[in-house]
Amino acid sequence: MTDSDVAADPQEPDSLSWREQAVARSLDSARLRAETRVQRFLDAAIELFNSGSGKDFTVQEVVDRSGQSLRSFYQYFGGKHELLLALFEESVRTTTEYLRVKVTDEDDPLERLHTFVVEYYRVCRPTPEQGATVPGRAPFMAEFAQQLLTEHPKEAARVFSPLVTLFEEVLDGAAAVGAVRAGPGHGPIVGVVLEAIMFNSFSSTIAGLSVDPGGQGTAEDLWDLIFHGIGTGATS
């Protein structure tokens, strides 16, 4: 085996998601059992988050709610940080799937971009009251994203890659019809726009305004701001 063969090994840790790394700690023969156990820990953590404790729950609380052992938890996760990463990764994945369905429903490339911006904004909105949910909502997405981007940029890049890929596809489609500016600058634009959508979803909270459950009006305002920043004016 050559050095290049080793480098190309698909099981390199950096190529695996946090959830996959947790499951990979188990023997292949027990993979299905490991998948089930990991999912039970993730489900327990989501329940705790939704119960109002946010991400301030303890590992022991997750263990107790999952009905499993502390020893089992540390078989799959190095600690609470890895559990939060796995949760956030699942949030990004489900959000990306939701957004892909929404943009696929649109035929016009510019309307696909419009739909992506508005729907992603709605997904990132803080829930104004218990029971008011948006399909595809990502638990603690904006809050944990800020911490992740600041303290662990390499991990953040991995976690956000599915969402970034989808947005690049949508942006390229709009550029192809001349609706937005084309060129090599799309890389920075992707990051700036995604960040603007995610963190502007809390603008009402910052300004001390009441939170609109749907957030549609504010989402459209943000779309106007973004489009006038990157649009060409060729398509209305």
Place the predicted regions along the sequence by residue.
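An amphipathic alpha-helix signature
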Residues: L42, H114, V118, V164-D172, ...
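Short secondary-structure transition hinges
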Residues: R122-E169, A176-V180, P188
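Amphipathic, non-transmembrane alpha-helical scaffold segments
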Residues: A34, V38, L84, F88, ...
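Generic hydrophobic, amphipathic alpha-helix propensity
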Residues: A34-A45, V62, L87-S91, T95, ...
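Hydrophobic alpha-helical connector segments
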Residues: A86, R100-Q130, G187-V190
